[in-house]
Swiss-Prot record:
Pfam hit, one: Adenylsucc_synt
Active site, per annotation: 13 (proton acceptor), 41 (proton donor)
Residues noted as binding Mg(2+) in the record, renumbered to the chain: 13, 40
Subunit: Homodimer.
Localization, UniProt: Cytoplasm
Cofactors (names): Mg(2+)
Annotated Gene3D superfamilies: Adenylosuccinate Synthetase, subunit A, domain 1 (3.40.440.10), Adenylosuccinate Synthetase, subunit A, domain 2 (1.10.300.10), Adenylosuccinate Synthetase, subunit A, domain 3 (3.90.170.10)
Chain positions recorded as GTP binding sites: 12-18, 40-42, 304, 330-332, 412-414
Molecular-function annotations in GO: adenylosuccinate synthase activity; GTP binding; magnesium ion binding
Known role: Plays an important role in the de novo pathway of purine nucleotide biosynthesis. Catalyzes the first committed step in the biosynthesis of AMP from IMP.
Protein name: Adenylosuccinate synthetase
Family as reported in the entry's similarity comment: Belongs to the adenylosuccinate synthetase family.
Catalytic activity, reaction form: IMP + L-aspartate + GTP = N(6)-(1,2-dicarboxyethyl)-AMP + GDP + phosphate + 2 H(+)
Length: 429
């Protein structure tokens, strides 16, 4: 049986939650391998709607959830999320959730620095969620992070906090923000330890056992390829690598761990916050896409920017992300539009490009080259087979396949998990 990684192929918010939920019902284990609680999934199960930011989506299907070492974990946010879903009747405990003991912790000072920096940027804001993800990754790379395993060694925490505060309080003071007292942080960590440590273990060992037992593993990515810290629209990106290759390192498994990479893309484009967006629409069509698609962020509540499908961007995501099949979502949002446009290239300073350059100045200057297609008047909502789709809708999907150079293996036609057209089963490789 194949192990599957699911990643976003645009700027996030592509509908990964529904697709992951659909796949999780057929997996044995669901693994988070990067990011933090800065991205959200909305899952509808029966009459319950779950909003998850840190917990693996498979938990709502009764599957084992694993948070890998590549994730930065805010312990307060984790416990709050567990309490919230538990109040909805979902049992989450050490039997159903395991967390890598070498995962980095997000502390209150990380969020404080995140917000202070963003405020200091003024009009040049990156658009972070202010939840401390970036500063926590900085500490990890600088080898001063406090990790979950450190909670089991309280005698070492004081010295580690000294090093941490030497760095962060200097930054906070320079930004004119309030600094932190060591004792308050130490007391908080000591109080959290007995609540967090029961979930901790070297998850690489468990995942090795799961793999050798032939069980199905679903790797659940957060954010998307175009928010990757290396391959995205830098500096308007997240602080981790979001491509499928990260699934191995972020969970403690080797590169052979992933057999199939499924990329999620909307049938149009959206983006939250700042950064280049060549196909963004500022007219009534853009408003229509936002209203029909209910385009508001799960975590921030911010209205998403909307535009036409960018085949150049998604093709690039396919190549650098290792995507072998696309799950195309929200096709029904395009129902009734008389004309559709797909971006097939960019004009930048008089030159035509079939890629998004790395230079921020070139990205900001990119003007889309469009190909127009006839829309469809019929409804695609709730379609569960190709026969249910209007002919023009099928043509639109086929053209996306041609331009992105990857097959559409799954098509979503409504938020309902059963309104899905399966072309190829990702778990069959």
């Amino acid at each position: 049986m194949a192990n599957v990684a699911v990643i976003g192929a645009q700027w996030g918010d592509e509908g990964k939650g529904k697709v992951v939920d659909w796949l999780a019902s057929r997996a044995d284990v669901v693994v988070r391998f990067q990011g933090g609680h800065n991205a959200g999934h909305t899952l509808v199960v029966g009459d319950q709607t779950y909003k998850l930011s840190l917990l693996p989506s498979g938990l709502v299907r009764g599957k084992l959830g694993i948070i890998g070492n590549g994730v930065v974990v805010d312990p307060e946010a984790l416990l709050s999320e567990i309490a919230r879903v538990s109040a909805q009747g979902l049992a989450v405990g050490p039997e159903t959730l395991r967390i890598a003991d070498n995962a980095t912790l997000i502390l209150p000072l990380h969020g404080a620095i995140d917000r202070a920096r963003e405020q200091a940027r003024g009009d040049s804001k990156i658009g972070t969620t202010g939840r401390g993800i970036g500063p926590a990754y900085e500490d990890k790379v600088a080898r001063r992070a406090i990790r979950i395993a450190d909670l089991a060694e309280p005698e070492t925490l004081s010295a580690k906090l000294d090093e941490l505060l030497l760095h962060h309080n200097t930054l906070l003071a320079g930004l004119g923000a309030e600094t932190f007292e060591k004792q308050a942080l130490l007391d908080q960590l000591l109080a959290l330890a007995p609540k967090i440590l029961p979930y901790a273990e070297p998850v690489w060992e468990r995942l090795d056992e799961i793999k050798r037992a032939g069980q199905r593993i679903l790797f659940e990515g957060a954010q998307a390829v175009m928010l990757d810290v290396d391959h995205g629209t830098y500096p308007f990106v997240t602080s981790s690598n979001t491509i499928a290759a990260t699934a191995a390192g972020g969970s403690g498994m080797g590169p052979s761990a992933v057999d199939f990479v499924l990329g999620i893309a909307k049938a149009y484009s959206t983006r939250v916050g700042s950064g280049p967006f060549p196909t963004e629409l500022f007219d009534e069509t853009g408003e229509l896409l936002g209203d029909r698609g209910h385009e508001f962020g799960t975590v921030t509540g911010r209205r998403r920017r909307c535009g036409w499908f960018d085949a150049v961007l998604v093709r690039q995501a396919v190549k650098v992300g290792g995507i072998q099949g696309l799950a195309l979502t929200k096709l029904d949002v395009l129902d009734g539009l008389p004309e559709l446009k797909i971006c097939t290239g960019y004009q930048i300073n008089g030159e035509t490009f079939r890629r998004l350059p790395a230079s921020p100045a070139a990205q900001a200057a990119a003007k889309p080259v469009y190909e127009s297609m006839e829309g469809w008047s019929g409804s695609t909502q709730g379609a569960r087979s190709w026969a249910d789709l209007p002919a023009q809708a099928i043509k639109y999907v086929r053209r996306i396949e041609e331009l992105t150079e990857v097959p559409v293996t799954l098509l979503s036609t409504s938020p309902d998990r059963d309104d899905t057209i399966l072309v190829k089963d990702p778990f069959e490789g």
